[in-house]
Design a protein with these regions (language model features):
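Peripheral, non-transmembrane regulatory/ligand-interaction domains of membrane transport proteins
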Residues: 1-182
Length: 184
């Protein structure tokens, strides 16, 4: 199920999802997982790669024995799912595989982005080696801030992967926990 905040209550009921808490995308400020008695609840706070320090995609998701509910007020999750459908012959016939593909889709452009940072830093290093140091600090500081932001985000995703792999609620098949190990 993919729903907006307004549709969340209905989607949760249809999926027989019991969540003890408020469902609010406005409170999403980082990536995390929480095991509850009846479901796993998680959030994604994904930096927009063209503006790492700016606004983010905010998504809530809930997993129980049979279903996944994704709450997203933008069309970001729908676009990810459409890309999964276009690019994957095995789109996610299990919840574990779907979660792996979903996270993989929003991380798919990260390597390219990190490569751009690497090129920028290498160009700056060459200038410094050539004795051109004017403006170096002003150029490097925003890059450093963006890389620190991305590092925090990736640390959160790794923690989330570990929590999924721990399978505290026993919602996932042991043989499929390997998908979460790849994320971690």
């Amino acid at each position: 199920f993919v729903a907006t905040s307004k549709e969340a209550k209905e989607a949760m009921e249809l999926a027989e999802m019991v969540y003890e808490g408020d469902i609010s995308l406005q409170t999403v400020s980082f990536c995390r997982m929480e095991a509850q008695q009846e479901c796993l609840a998680g959030s994604f706070c994904i930096p927009k790669l063209l503006d790492v320090q700016g606004s983010r995609y905010r998504i809530l998701f809930f997993i129980n024995q049979r279903h996944i509910v994704i709450i997203d007020d933008n069309d970001f999750s729908w676009r990810l799912i459409m890309r999964i459908r276009q690019n994957r012959t095995k789109q996610g016939e299990t919840r574990e595989h779907f979660i792996y593909n979903f996270i993989g889709q929003f991380m798919s452009r990260d390597v390219e982005t990190l490569g751009r940072y690497e090129s920028l830093i290498m160009d700056m290093e060459e200038k410094v080696m050539d004795g051109v140091i004017e403006g170096f600090q002003n150029e490097i500081m925003p890059i450093r801030k963006e890389l620190l932001t991305l590092r925090g985000y990736y640390d959160q995703l790794m923690d989330m992967g570990k929590e999924l792999e721990e399978n505290e609620n026993g919602f996932f098949a042991k043989k499929r926990l390997k998908y979460f190990g790849i994320i971690a």
